[in-house]
Every structure is written in structure tokens, then in C-alpha cells.
């Protein structure tokens, strides 16, 4: 028996994203994203690290600006495993970001769903969201895993949907980390 760690990271991260949305996502988020993530039609990613916020997530600068029933996400994340690929038609990014009045430190981080392609109410794919890979990281031993620098909001802001309560994003991200 053998395994390919580069490839295995994709379903492992997807399982973590499924767990986080299952535990703290709204009924609408669960209905919209989980069926295609569970079936493997879509994949999920974990977006924590920033150039100035590696192991110190209190320094996260990615912003989430309220805009009606969603948020506009602005920022850049690094070391995003399976951040950009063509293996599935959509990637559901789970992103840590700060809302305008968030307290400082890790107690001011919220979690957002930021899909690569927006998802219409009927489940079909809509427009490309304002999220893209800036570059591919070169990591020893897992060359088949597209680990990326991801940019959110270079144009009008990436559309994001808050998962769970505001300012509890780090606790929610640990659900994903423990599963993945």
C-alpha cells in the first residue's frame, strides 16, 4: 500500500471545511455548500497565514467589510494548500478576517466562506469571485500540491459570508484543523 501526501491534502482539507460548516454554518450555508463538498464535486481550503501573521494569528490584517447580506473581503493569505486548481469546478475558501469594529488580537477574528465562483440559490455556479492565486509556493516534498499565495479583493472585494458568530473565527477554524 502507498499514498501520495500531495494529493491526500486536498480531501483532508475538504473534510475539515465540511466539519466547520457542518458545526457552525447557517442552514442556508449547509444547504448551499455541503452537498457538493461532501460529494467531492467541490473542494475546501483553510486560509489563516499572512506574511506578517504566521504563527501569530493576532496579527491577521485581512478585512471583512459588511455589504448587505454578505461581506467584502480584502487581503492576502500565504501557504494556502490546494488554493487554486482545476480539479473541481469550485473551491470553497474558509478565510479568517477582521470586521471593522473587531477587538484586537485573536478575539477579533471571524470566519468567512469565500467561494472561487459565487453559488446561485439553485446551486449552479455564478460569476467568478474576486479571489485568485498570486503565485505558487515551492515546498519540499509536496510538489503535486498547489500551495498558493491567495489574493482576496484586488478589484471590488471578494464576496464572503460569515460563518457562525462574529469574532469567534479562530475557535471555528480549530474545528477544521482538528478534522483535517
Whereabouts are the PLM-identified features?
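Internal helix-loop-helix
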Residues: 1-31, 35, 39-40, 88-92, ...
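Glycine- and acidic
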Residues: 1-5, 14-19, 45-47, 74-79, ...
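Short acidic, glycine/serine/threonine-rich loops at helix termini
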Residues: 19-25, 55-60, 83-92, 106-107, ...
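Gly/Pro-rich turn-and-neighbor structural signature
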Residues: 21-66, 70-72, 78-79
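Structured core elements
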Residues: 45-47, 61-65, 72-74, 79-81, ...
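Short Gly/Pro-enriched turn/cap motifs at secondary-structure boundaries
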Residues: 52-55, 84-86, 101-103, 139-146
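A short core secondary-structure module
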Residues: 70, 74-128
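A glycine-rich, basic-preceded beta-loop-alpha segment at the flavin cofactor/substrate interface
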Residues: 79-81, 118-134, 139, 146-178
